[in-house]
């Protein structure tokens, strides 16, 4: 990589199943990885020798299921005891354990048991995306705009920002995926001037968002947003997998439920079948020697696939209804319905959506896999002053808070301070008071959600307002100030108004929230892992070079014509040097330097022998 630092910021779509990176240098470019793929699997694998990220990790998943981690986005910012986490754990081959209420992934790496937070796994994927960009740009990348589902809550957003920090990136902004896609659509279609209402339908590998935007004169205003942070292509694959498991059991009497390798192979076949059925109406699924020597073969029609996922497909229309209701807009007022996310390629999903909008033609002008990274790169260029075109220079994004924010009041009633779909950044205030005479401390639990009962919302943290002057109940005026920044991340402060003094306020750490010390430690660990990866790669290359050189010299020595030209003494010396080189290759954990020395030693003897012929 060349010297120098890239002045702009890359855009990263950190996906559940695949990630994508884009850069802006006079125009947007989606950057392909070393395999030539424009999307990279969000997979990290750990082996006794090395760590693999992306295609290399996914390709060996069936051979190493327990140490191949994916779906980190379905864990990030969540509690271990959440229902979705518990359900997912039943389908994952890797181990997830409870550490102080947070889910932590446990794997075997370099011969040891290691634990990684979802933030660390995500940071490894982000590092990979950063390296893909650096290889193309030829400069060091330090800044990024990272996207998240619009429906991500505060904890999930903060955890994603932390993952960026662990990977060594300065995360300039966390932006919502459908909003990023809207930028790609607006710019790509050259339609950012015409005033219109656009509905972004974003169904990816693991998450689902619907956002309704008003676009006019380069100003993108999100009117409302809804979704499901736990719905996507993975769930359709799981339903297919369950169906195939049943078929296999019916035919053979064998249950593969506890065999991680067989499950991985069958899931891969299910995913392939799902993709195929987007373009044909029938396919055959074959897996040789799936379990206990038995092959698996089944035919699958598109109709059967649709039937297996009918309830999930239908559920995608609920957030569509919700955003229209929240924005107080009728479906006839929607000018365009834009498809984003790989799962929108499914014909049945498209038909349901088109029918809902009375046969409206859906907008497919943008690449559903790349649109989000495209929009993030544009936002990165704007934030770093690198955007050059008139279209992007004047572009303004006005997004919203996806879920209401507020405090728990007496009787566990949720007191909303920031209603959902409030444009961010925003500052909202609400006054509270004491419930007991001479009360000097009030505890404010901060929640995010839409339910009246606090217990059914997400607890983000708690703070104590202390040193309140003793007064009769109901007299003190306590003002809670909720500040939501452009990333959708919350900061809460409080003031005791009657004396004009601001009071101490600390938000205690929410479960799984990383402190700055934690992040620093993880940054250092990430550097160590990277160094270990590089050392392994160098060692592997040096060993391969030595092996191929040894093979070519062995050929020379054993070739009657070539060896007859060598002096007897020279041939003996070469054979001795060859034996030394072969011994070096036998060393299990030889270093790159040892292999290099063995190669140099052998070359020296060979060169001398050849020149003295």
Curated annotation (Swiss-Prot):
Catalytic activity: ATP + H2O = ADP + phosphate + H(+)
PROSITE patterns for this protein: HSP70_1, HSP70_2, HSP70_3
Entry's localization field: Cytoplasm
GO cellular component: cytosol; fungal biofilm matrix
Keyword list, A-Z: ATP-binding, Chaperone, Cytoplasm, Hydrolase, Nucleotide-binding, Protein biosynthesis
Broad class of where this protein is predominantly found: cytoplasm
Top EC group: hydrolase
Annotated segments matching region Nucleotide binding domain (NBD): 1-391
Region (Inter-domain linker) location: 392-402
Keyword Hydrolase among record annotations: yes
Highest rank taxon of the organism: Eukaryota
Known EC number: 3.6.4.10
GO MF terms held by the record: ATP binding; ATP hydrolysis activity; ATP-dependent protein folding chaperone
Similarity comment: Belongs to the heat shock protein 70 family. Ssb-type Hsp70 subfamily.
Protein name per the record: Ribosome-associated molecular chaperone SSB
Oligomeric form and interacting partners: Binds to ribosomes. Binds close to the ribosomal tunnel exit via contacts with both ribosomal proteins and rRNA. Directly interacts with nascent polypeptides. This interaction is dependent on the ribosome-associated complex (RAC). Interacts with SSE1. Interacts with FES1.
């Amino acid at each position: 990589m060349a010297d120098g630092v890239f002045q702009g910021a890359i855009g990263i779509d950190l996906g559940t199943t695949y990630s994508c990176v884009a850069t802006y240098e006079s125009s947007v470019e989606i950057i392909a990885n070393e395999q030539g793929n424009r999307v990279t699997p969000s997979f990290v694998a750990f082996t006794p020798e090395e760590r693999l990220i992306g295609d290399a990790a996914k390709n060996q998943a069936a051979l190493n299921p327990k140490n191949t981690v994916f779906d980190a986005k379905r864990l990030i910012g969540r509690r271990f005891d959440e229902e979705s986490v518990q359900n997912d754990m039943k389908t994952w081959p890797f181990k997830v354990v409870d550490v102080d209420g947070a889910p932590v992934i446990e794997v075997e790496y370099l011969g040891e048991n290691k634990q990684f937070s979802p933030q660390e796994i995500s940071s490894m994927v982000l590092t990979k995306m950063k390296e893909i960009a650096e290889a193309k740009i030829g400069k060091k990348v330090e800044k990024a705009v990272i996207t998240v589902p619009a429906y991500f809550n505060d904890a999930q957003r903060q955890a994603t920002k932390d993952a960026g920090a662990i990977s060594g990136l300065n995360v300039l902004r966390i932006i919502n995926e459908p909003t990023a896609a809207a930028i790609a659509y607006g710019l790509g279609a050259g339609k950012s001037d015409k005033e219109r209402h656009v509905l972004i339908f974003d169904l990816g590998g693991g998450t689902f968002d619907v956002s309704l935007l008003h676009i006019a004169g380069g100003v993108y205003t999100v009117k409302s947003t809804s979704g499901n942070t736990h719905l996507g292509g993975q769930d359709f694959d799981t339903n297919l997998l369950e169906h195939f498991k049943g078929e296999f059991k019916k035919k053979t009497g064998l249950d593969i439920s506890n065999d991680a390798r067989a499950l991985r192979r069958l899931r891969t076949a299910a995913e392939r079948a799902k993709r195929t059925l987007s373009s044909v109406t029938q396919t055959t699924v074959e897996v040789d020697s799936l379990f206990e020597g038995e092959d698996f073969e089944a035919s699958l029609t598109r109709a059967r696939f649709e039937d297996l996922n009918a309830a999930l497909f239908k559920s995608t229309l609920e957030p569509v209804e919700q955003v229209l209701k929240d924005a107080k807009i009728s479906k006839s007022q929607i000018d365009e319905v834009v498809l984003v996310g790989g799962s929108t390629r499914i014909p049945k999903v498209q038909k349901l959506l088109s029918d809902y909008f009375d046969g409206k033609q859906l907008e497919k002008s943008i690449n559903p896999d790349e649109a989000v990274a495209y929009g993030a790169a544009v936002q990165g260029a704007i934030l770093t002053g690198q955007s050059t075109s008139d279209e992007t220079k004047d572009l303004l994004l006005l997004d919203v808070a996806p879920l209401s924010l507020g405090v728990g009041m007496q009787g566990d009633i949720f007191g909303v301070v920031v209603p959902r779909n409030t444009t961010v950044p925003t500052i909202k205030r609400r006054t509270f008071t004491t419930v007991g005479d001479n009360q000097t401390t009030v505890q404010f639990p901060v929640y995010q959600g839409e339910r009246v009962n606090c217990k059914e919302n997400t607890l983000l943290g708690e703070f104590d307002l202390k040193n309140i002057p003793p007064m009769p109940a109901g007299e003190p005026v306590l003002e809670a100030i909720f500040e939501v920044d452009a990333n959708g991340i919350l900061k809460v402060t409080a003031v005791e108004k009657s004396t004009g003094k601001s009071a101490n306020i600390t938000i205690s750490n929410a479960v799984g929230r990383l402190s700055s010390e934690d992040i620093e430690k993880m940054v250092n660990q990430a550097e160590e892992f990277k160094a270990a990866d590089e050392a392994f790669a160098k060692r592997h290359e040096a060993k391969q070079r030595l092996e191929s050189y040894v093979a070519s010299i062995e050929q020379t020595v054993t070739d009657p014509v070539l060896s007859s030209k060598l002096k007897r003494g020279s041939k003996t010396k070469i054979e001795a040097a060859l034996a030394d080189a072969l011994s070096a290759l036998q060393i299990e954990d030889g270093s790159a330097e040892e292999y290099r020395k063995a190669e140099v030693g052998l070359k020296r003897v060979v060169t001398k022998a050849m020149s003295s012929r």
